[in-house]
Amino acid sequence: MRQKFEKSPDLFTIPISVTKFHSNCRDEAPKLLKGLQTIFMDEELNESIFLLLSDRINNKRAALIKSGRTGMGLWEILVLCVMRQGLNANYDRIHYLANSDTIMRSIMGIESESNLAVDRKQYGLTTIKDNVALLDEQTLNEINAIVVGYGHRLLKKKKKRFG
């Protein structure tokens, strides 16, 4: 069974909640990553999305568990999939970002402050393809509906506060 997120990362792993973004960047990637950071930090949103992911992905991967590989965590799969869809990127670009972009790696929960090449978790292209393929269009649409509902609730709260 895949884990939601690695519960006890090493001492040098940068926490997702403290990831900093460039404030004046107009690229789409930081906006997507900020959204993912919000999903990770909001308990209610996090729980509902991971419940859905766990149900869909863990059921599909039963056959590969026999191979002895633990596979990526649900959070890593979600981040890779959202970035691929949101940037309309091919697998080669996602492979590059997952292994080289420090902010994306920090949101994935795998970036270390030590920056030693030996310590850095790396993903193979085939690993990314196999894991991202586990999220089908229906699951992504359901996740989208959950996130949009969350956004609507935030707007209602904001209107009540200022209205």
Language-model features: where?
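Charged, often Cys/His-bearing segments associated with DNA-binding zinc-finger transcription factors
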Residues: M1-L51
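Catalytic micro-motifs at enzyme active sites that drive phosphoryl/nucleotidyl and oxygen chemistry
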Residues: K66-R69, M83, G109-A117
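Alpha-helical support elements that line or immediately flank enzyme active sites
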Residues: L78-N88
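Helix-turn-helix DNA-binding elements, focusing on the entry/boundary residues of the two helices
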Residues: Y91
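Non-catalytic DNA-binding core/recognition domains of DNA-processing enzymes
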Residues: T70, E76, A98-N99, K121, ...
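Active-site- or DNA-interface-adjacent structural scaffold in DNA-acting proteins
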Residues: E111-G163
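Basic, short loop/linker segments at the boundary and entry of helix-turn-helix/winged-helix-like folds
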Residues: Q37-V79
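DNA-recognition alpha helix
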Residues: I94-I110, G151
